[in-house]
Curated annotation (Swiss-Prot):
Name used for this protein in its record: Interleukin-1 receptor antagonist protein
Superkingdom of the source species: Eukaryota
Record bears the keyword Phosphoprotein: no
GO molecular function, one term: interleukin-1 receptor antagonist activity
Subcellular location: Secreted
Pfam families: IL1
Gene Ontology annotations for the cellular component aspect, listed alphabetically: extracellular space
Keyword field contains Glycoprotein: yes
Length: 177
């Protein structure tokens, strides 16, 4: 019986091709992954919704549950992604204004963003999973994390003190069915 003598690189490539993860898509030239919708809520069970063109986190009940915003995701690297809402037409961005850094919503089509363009880096977030929860760090502003306030119906923002007890940086992040 003759043993196949192929390079390990080919075997590894074949295995990666056969057993890839949808949430860890990797671009090969043009981005092969399509936009996916996710539900997001913080560890205090506050969901995201839009109020006066601002993304806020609060407790939605009864008929208000339909106001929940799904997060549109386009993976750009194994743990980096563009985040948007409204079918990917409004994108979350790390906005620098002087010494201030804040979360913004910009009217940009998420599928038009390009991870190799420096000006699009502000829309990229790095996903870190820790058990059942996920945190999102800005790629453009390292050390700044997506956060919610402890109080309900407050704007979703960014913080550079993720261990601070007045900000929530841990989220449940689940693909929408």
């Amino acid at each position: 019986m003759e043993v196949c003598r192929c390079h390990h690189g080919y075997l590894i490539s074949l295995l990666l091709f056969l057993f890839h993860s949808e949430t860890a898509c990797y671009p090969l030239g043009k981005r092969p992954c399509e936009m996916q919708a996710f539900r997001i809520w913080d560890v205090n069970q506050k969901t995201f919704y839009l109020r006066n063109n601002q993304l806020v986190a609060g407790y939605l009940q009864g008929p208000n549950t339909k106001l929940e915003e799904k997060i549109d995701v386009v993976p750009i690297e194994p743990h980096a992604m563009f985040l948007g809402i409204h079918g990917g037409k409004l994108c979350l961005a790390c906005v620098k204004s002087g010494d201030e850094i804040k979360l913004g919503l910009e009217p940009v089509n998420i599928t038009d963003l390009n991870s190799s363009k420096e000006e699009d880096k502000r829309f990229a977030f790095i996903r870190s999973d820790s058990g059942p929860t996920t945190s999102f760090e800005s790629a453009a502003c390292p050390g700044w994390f997506l956060c919610t306030a402890l109080e309900t119906d407050q704007p979703v923002g960014l913080t550079n003190t993720p261990q601070d007890a007045v900000q929530v940086t841990k989220f449940y992040f689940q693909q929408d069915q």
